Amino acid sequence: MSGPHRTFSFEQRGDGEAHSSFMDHAMHPQYDDVSPISNMSSSPGHMNETHHGLASVPEDNHQGWGQARGPSPSNRTGFTATPEMDNLGPASVGGGISGIALGVANSHDRLSGVEARRGTDGQEANIPAERGYNTTGSDNPYIPAPPDMGGYGSSETLHPRQSYGSNVALGAAAGPAGQLTPGHSATHLGTSNSSQRNLYDAPYQSAGGLSAGPYQRHSAYSSNDLPLDINPEEIADDGDDGFAPAGNSRSSARRSQAVPAAAGGAAAGGVLGGIGGLFNNRNPAETSYDPVPGAGLEAGEKSQWVKPKPSTGSRKRGWIIGAILAVIIIGAIVGGAVGGTIGHKDSGDSASGSSASTQSASGDTDTNGDLDKNSAEIKALMNNKDLHKVFPGMDYTPWGVQYPLCLKYPPSQNNVTRDMAVLAQLTNNVRLYGTDCNQTEMVLHAIDKLDLKDMKVWLGVWIDTNETTSRRQIDQLYKIVDDAKDISIFNGAIVGNEALFRAGDNKITAQATLTKYMQEVRDHFKKHDIKMPIATSDLGDNWNAELVQIADVVMSNVHPFFGGIPVDQAAAWTWRFWQDHDVILTQGTDKRQVISEVGWPSGGGNDCGKGANCPDDTSGAVAGIDELNKFMEDWVCQALDNGTDYFWFEAFDEPWKIEFNTKNENWEDKWGLMDPARKLKSGLKIPDCGGKTAA
């Protein structure tokens, strides 16, 4: 989509941040979408109080890549990439870096369209810097500088999308049944303006500014109930399975609550989303695309949606359709409840054929035993010549680790073992998003059973507005680390994923709370003589000097796809954005810098920085196998050669995220290198980098 091109220049401020000024040039294309990479500024002047984080992000008019820059303030909107839910059932083939992310590069919930801009000052500059990109320079280590393209709109001209963690479901299907309890907490990461929230978006809103996380799947219905009036004050649960607070901006743009309960429930998630619009009246003129944080583990993490309100002339037809869909929903819920115990991602021709598709987690173990490296099924999975260990890290969230659903339908240890058997052929470094449902313990057990001596784990702690959830997560982290026989298997602990992004205009308060949690973890480790890096991950533009000071590692989510970046420029843009917004913040320190999420969808349409509003189907960032191959070709081996540290998002598709798809944006469930059954996608080629492997 064309639009005025903006040139930005930085003016160094006393606080170490850069201030951007810009000029509009009507002759150049502008990429106006929000990416999971964008983040929000703490400066109140850059953000409307009703917006959940969309703010202008200063960016300079770069002449070359990789050159030292002054720190860039983080004035972004929320995104979350990144995943962790297994609505498909405990026995589901665990190949899914479920959840948050896409969040994916910057984040976590994604949002586009009119809703993405709601609450902003109306200026195109109020967008994440990661969304746009400038012409490439000769300093880029990935690809030769291309000819002048006339200047692409900087990321500032892009609308932010919410990002997702790998544990976050991008679609309604991400929300498992049973997680209805609204979250509420006294201590939260920032308080958003609840008075401006639409009750349809979040009937039971959290007190905090952070939308629900990957662990919180929002659903309007439980596996046993149809829509009913619920008094959140009467619910005894801690609420981490409740609705994520939805703001009028990204977070508020939720579709109707939909929750697939089992493998067969993924499709039902889409139906639920449609029905929500019939059972509830809502005013938005356009449908917004934005997963709720908390529908998956990192879209927790994430999943309320908004459907257009039926016009008066179509009300009767709407009720008829609603009645029909209600019948389907009831069947889906009933089937989901049953499927929750049998959901299995297995496919007939997958290597895990020994596991019946109707098995529960315990049934899988009863039939196959506790899988290990000597199991025939595991040997087959670990002998895939098309997989190469060229990724420094992989974002991963096992299926079925959404609390409290996992209490009723426990995740499958064997599925985690199967996943790890595959992941071990891609990387020696796995990143988790949370500690609920024994997911960390299952990963450690799988590593032991498979004898993966080189495999390391980045522990994840999900932080959100619900203090009970955060407390449970942190306490479990302590238990895991304190009970570990050898902590050398841990590369570090990531406290929070895109917590600042989800805080919206309350980023300052959220950062204070986040750093408090980080310091608490640091103090605990010190007290127990545990030497382990402490970090947090957020949109690339959300990092600032204060956050860098308390973190041992700067971890940023960066997604070129949501910036509408053509794939032949994506690798260069990603590296440059990371260098100019994150790496530069660590100059003069010994802090490491890591891209915590980066990837490309294998299908579903194209994004021109403004969602699917492209003039044709070849403009902007195009999702596809060829494009995914191109991005890996330009990024993977070069990153391996120059030592760029990153986590790929992601290894496995997450089918439940289909609910987040729209008519022209059908990529939410297609970020994996493999399908849910752990089979490499047709035509996809993972670079072998001449035999070189990641450490």
Curated annotation (Swiss-Prot):
Comp. bias regions, Polar residues: 36-45, 188-198
User: What ranges does the record list as Low complexity composition bias?
Assistant: 349-366
Annotated EC: 3.2.1.39
Q: Which InterPro entries match?
A: Beta-glucan_modifiers (IPR050732), Glycoside_hydrolase_SF (IPR017853)
Catalytic residues, chain numbering: E498 (proton donor), E597 (nucleophile)
| Recorded topology in the membrane | Single-pass type II membrane protein
Which positions are glycosylated? Answer: N415, N438, N466, N642
The answer to keyword Transferase applying to this record is no
* GO terms assigned for molecular function: glucan endo-1,3-beta-D-glucosidase activity
Cytoplasmic-side positions: 1-317
Top-level division of the source organism's lineage: Eukaryota
**TM region(s), chain numbering:** 318-338
- State its location(s): Cell membrane
Q: Name one GO biological process term.
A: cell wall organization
* Recorded GO CC terms: cell surface; extracellular region; fungal-type cell wall; plasma membrane
Q: Sum up the protein's function in the record's words.
A: Glucanases play a role in cell expansion during growth, in cell-cell fusion during mating, and in spore release during sporulation. This enzyme may be involved in beta-glucan degradation. Active on laminarin and lichenan.
**PANTHER family assigned to the protein according to its UniProt record, in alphabetical order:** GLUCAN 1,3-BETA-GLUCOSIDASE (PTHR16631), GLUCAN ENDO-1,3-BETA-GLUCOSIDASE BTGC (PTHR16631:SF17)
Protein name in the entry:
Probable glucan endo-1,3-beta-glucosidase btgC
Q: What is the originating organism of this protein?
A: Aspergillus clavatus (strain ATCC 1007 / CBS 513.65 / DSM 816 / NCTC 3887 / NRRL 1 / QM 1276 / 107)
Upper lineage: Eukaryota, Fungi, Dikarya, Ascomycota, Pezizomycotina
